[in-house]
């Protein structure tokens, strides 16, 4: 009878065995297991045989990998010991590697901190996806005029007409409030008026107080924990009273956690919107009078198209009448909370915005420095690895596989990267305060222990370790053992060529960044020293904050004018660097035409105090009673814009407030930064408070001093101020300093690029120093022979530097045009800019060659001074 054939072993288990078991055991192991399987199947059945087979496969695989893990652990320990010995033996090169990589990783960590801070603006609010800020767009003759704020009446009216709007919040930031605390008087910034719903719509966790009631009543305030501690120390602030100069006292009804700094509305205290009659002022305000920031909370997945479809009836009810009065069509713009920080360029009265170019610059800086550090490591590793050829050959002879060697060399790279990571983390921790001060950042120590950042940094460590070590690992492991043992020290043409390319690449970046830095410095100095059309030096600007002070200004001015060291005194609402805007009708060729122009509100002697020049007509004159309400001075740009041949007497109106005419033309001067061209501008007189007209309350008192006695006059001026206003701190600024602050962002960018250029130079010089050390070692015998044949140390140094001179020269040739492209892009944002200086480029090139020569000559000179007998003794 024919014997019944039995089924084979389980296919999946057999496939796993072939996949995971070592190659040399596949056939014997599979054959043995299959024989036993057949035997068990005959005696006990196929089911038990399959179970046995699967269990044996599992045990075999587990045993194999357990042995592999054990062996890997032993080898890993061996790698650590071996690498530590290498570091001790070659301290100099490893120190350069640690320094370069630590610098690169530290810069990357700082970049991550900055990007995380900037790209998560306002995302700490739970409802961020559903919160929208409404902005205003006033369209005149097809031209949009964008305002970040809206009428205080908009929020309540929208809530009434649109039931789908879940809630609204009005926020009104206050410039400063004078808080009284005992005998002290402190100007407090970042205080806002807001509706009680702010604590429900936005995420401001309450530490003390009731979210439902703490801002419901008038004259109540919620403080941040920092402000509460500032005013009340360790006492419980709840129920305490804060005195406000010339206003009702405020009662503390809540304390919130300090908001993150990456919020577009920085808050230190919230006053209930019903305080001081603010809510009553909003009842009948026109939609054409923007003053507050309005936020609405919309339902999830709400389609804004639905809102705009319903807007026409709302417009007819609340806006149509004012459209005819103002000659503007009113439109609403919805911006999601997370988009405000970067997407509202061009909005008037906008909060401080983020700068995307700053973010891109910082990102690419971090990438460039990291690439430089990795290139530096690869360069040094390949140069140093040439001295390890015999070691690699011996390991191959003793049985090490290519995989083992790759793992060993990658392990060395990862260990170096890990040590560099530890040092870089410490360096960042120690430098946070310095970075905050230099670059106006707001980094905190706690940001370094953020889980996301830690995960990113660990990923960065692995990436750097693998990328930096992979080329040296494969480069060395590919060498044949016989060749390696016979040659011992190797420097193939390919390896040398690659190292030269890497050094040249480093210097291209370094020289390019130095050129960019120098031109940025040149542009900033150009802006600081350019003739602005007025004299900004020696002008003290004193901020006038409340009505009590303003009432005393006429008497105070007379007191100041009596001082022989004071040239002139004037009041103004705006000053150069901070003008306002307004919509006016001007007499044109086709009748009265609508325009939105810049406006400076000024008192008598404003032009004289500023040091500007009247080129046609006259200045404001107290003897002309109509000047205060009807007199207007315009600049030359406005005259050209309007095409006026005889500007004096031209009519200018504004709504029902102004029916004026041009009395004079002032020579063009820069009333804004040099980023922008001089634009059309009007200068109007400050009205009397009782006239109830725009420009009724001056904002600044400007005093021009004689430069010879500046310090003494400032002391006298403070003494006079304290006499007239004993309850107000003497807070002032110099006009030239205020104007210089317009370029703070440019200076921060310049400081950033300076730091970047220093780091790039350091890393490049480290690479050059390491490579020159390797070159000197490689050419030791050549140098000895040259010395024997009569060459001097200077000749030897020059011969050895010749190898690097070509690289530096090539880097200069590439870096100059590339950097000029970036410079032209950066200068493009300035209406007035400096030119390209060939001398600056030549000086940079010469400086780069000299620095490279001094760096490379260190090792060359040391070898050149060595006794040739020492190097030729065994030849």
Regions picked out by a protein language model, each given a short descriptive name:
Residues 1-88, 868-873:
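Negatively charged linear elements and acidic catalytic determinants
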Residues 70-98, 348-351, 381-418, 429-549, ...:
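Alpha-helical transmembrane segments of integral membrane proteins
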Residues 73-74, 80-83, 89-115, 354-390, ...:
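Hydrophobic alpha-helical transmembrane segments of multi-pass inner-membrane transport and secretion
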Residues 119-128, 268-280, 342-350, 426-454, ...:
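Short juxtamembrane loops and helix-capping segments at transmembrane helix boundaries
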Residues 195-208, 219-357, 555-745:
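Mid-to-C-terminal secondary-structure elements
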Residues 391-432, 760, 781-824, 843, ...:
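Transmembrane alpha-helical interface segments in multi-pass membrane proteins
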Residues 453-472, 511, 765, 840-862:
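Hydrophobic alpha-helical transmembrane segments of polytopic membrane proteins
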């Amino acid at each position: 009878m024919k014997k019944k054939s039995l089924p084979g072993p389980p296919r999946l288990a057999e496939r796993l065995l072939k996949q995971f078991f070592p190659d040399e055991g596949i056939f014997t192991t599979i054959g043995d297991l299959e024989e036993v399987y057949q035997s068990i199947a005959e005696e006990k059945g196929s089911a038990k045989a399959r179970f046995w087979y699967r269990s044996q496969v599992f045990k075999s695989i587990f045993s194999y990998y357990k042995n592999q893990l054990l062996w890997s652990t032993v080898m890993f320990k061996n790698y650590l010991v071996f690498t530590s010995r290498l570091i001790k033996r070659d301290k100099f090169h490893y120190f350069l590697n640690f320094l370069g990589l630590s610098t690169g990783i530290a810069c990357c960590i700082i970049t991550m901190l900055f990007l995380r801070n900037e790209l998560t603006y306002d995302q700490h609010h739970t409802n961020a996806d559903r919160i929208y800020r409404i902005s205003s767009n006033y369209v005149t003759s097809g031209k949009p005029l964008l305002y970040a704020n809206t009428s205080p009446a908009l929020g309540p009216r929208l809530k009434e007409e649109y039931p789908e709007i879940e809630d609204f919040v009005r926020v009104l930031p206050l410039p400063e409030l004078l808080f009284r605390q005992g005998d002290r008087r402190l100007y407090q910034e970042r205080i806002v008026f807001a509706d009680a719903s702010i604590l429900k719509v936005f995420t401001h966790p309450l530490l003390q107080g009731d979210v439902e009631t703490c801002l419901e009543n008038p004259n109540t305030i919620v403080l941040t924990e920092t402000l509460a501690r500032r005013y009340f120390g360790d006492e419980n602030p709840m129920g305490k009273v804060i005195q406000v100069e010339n206003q009702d006292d405020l009662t503390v009804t809540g304390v919130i956690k300090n908001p993150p700094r990456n919020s577009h509305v920085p808050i230190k205290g919230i006053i209930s919107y019903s305080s001081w009659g603010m809510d009553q002022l909003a009842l009948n305000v026109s939609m054409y009078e923007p003053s507050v920031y309005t936020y609405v909370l919309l339902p999830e997945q709400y389609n804004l198209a639905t809102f705009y479809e319903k807007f026409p009836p709302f417009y007819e009810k609340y806006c149509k009448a004012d459209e005819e009065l103002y000659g503007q069509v009113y439109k609403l713009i919805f911006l999601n909370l997370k988009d405000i920080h970067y997407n509202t360029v061009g909005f008037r009265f906008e909060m401080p915005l983020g700068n995307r170019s700053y973010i891109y610059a910082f990102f690419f800086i971090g990438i460039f420095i990291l690439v430089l550090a990795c290139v530096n490591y690869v360069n040094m590793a390949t140069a140093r690895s040439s001295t390890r050829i015999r070691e690699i050959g011996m390991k191959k002879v003793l049985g090490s596989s290519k995989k083992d060697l790759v793992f060993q060399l990658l392990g060395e790279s990862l260990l170096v990267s890990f040590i560099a990571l530890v040092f870089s983390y410490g360096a960042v921790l120690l430098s946070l305060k310095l970075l905050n001060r230099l670059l106006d950042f707001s980094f905190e120590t706690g940001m370094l222990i953020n889980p996301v950042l830690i995960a990113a940094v660990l990923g960065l460590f692995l990436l750097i370790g693998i990328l930096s070590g992979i080329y040296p690992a494969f480069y060395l492991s590919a060498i044949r053992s016989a060749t390696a043992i016979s040659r011992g020290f190797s420097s193939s043409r390919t390896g040398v060529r690659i190292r030269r390319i890497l050094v040249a690449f480093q210097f291209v970046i370094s020289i390019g960044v130095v050129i960019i830095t120098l031109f940025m410095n040149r542009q900033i100095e150009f802006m600081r020293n350019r003739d602005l059309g007025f004299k900004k030096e020696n002008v003290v600007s004193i901020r006038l904050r409340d009505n009590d002070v303003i009432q005393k200004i006429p008497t105070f001015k007379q007191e100041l004018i009596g001082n022989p060291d004071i040239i002139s005194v004037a009041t103004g609402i705006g000053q150069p660097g901070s003008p306002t805007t307004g919509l006016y009708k001007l007499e044109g060729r086709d009748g009265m035409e609508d325009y939105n122009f810049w406006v400076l509100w000024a008192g008598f002697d404003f032009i004289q105090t500023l040091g500007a020049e009247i080129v046609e007509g006259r200045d404001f004159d107290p003897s002309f009673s109509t000047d205060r309400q009807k007199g207007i001075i315009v600049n030359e740009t406005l005259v050209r814009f309007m095409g006026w041949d005889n500007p004096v007497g031209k009519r200018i109106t504004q709504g029902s407030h102004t029916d004026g005419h041009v009395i004079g033309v002032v020579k063009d001067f820069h009333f804004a930064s040099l980023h922008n061209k001089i634009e059309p501008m009007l200068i109007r007189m400050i009205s009397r408070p009782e006239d109830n007209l725009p420009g009724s309350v001056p904002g600044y008192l400007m005093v021009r001093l004689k430069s010879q006695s500046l310090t003494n006059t400032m002391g006298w001026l403070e003494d006079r101020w304290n006499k007239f206003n004993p309850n107000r701190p003497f807070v002032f600024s110099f006009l030239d300093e205020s104007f210089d602050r317009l370029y703070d962002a440019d200076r921060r960018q310049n400081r950033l690029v300076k730091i970047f250029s220093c780091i790039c130079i350091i890393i490049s010089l480290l690479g050059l120093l390491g490579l020159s050390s390797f070159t000197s070692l490689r050419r030791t015998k050549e140098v000895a022979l040259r010395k024997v044949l009569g060459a001097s140390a200077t000749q030897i140094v020059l011969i050895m530097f010749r190898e690097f001179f070509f690289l530096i020269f090539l880097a200069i040739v590439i870096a100059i045009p590339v950097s000029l492209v970036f410079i032209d892009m950066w200068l493009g944002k300035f209406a007035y800019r400096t030119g390209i200086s060939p001398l600056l480029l030549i000086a940079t090139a010469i400086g780069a060659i000299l620095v490279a020569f001094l760096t490379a000559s260190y090792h060359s000179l040391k070898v050149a001074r060595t006794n040739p007998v020492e190097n030729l003794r065994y030849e």
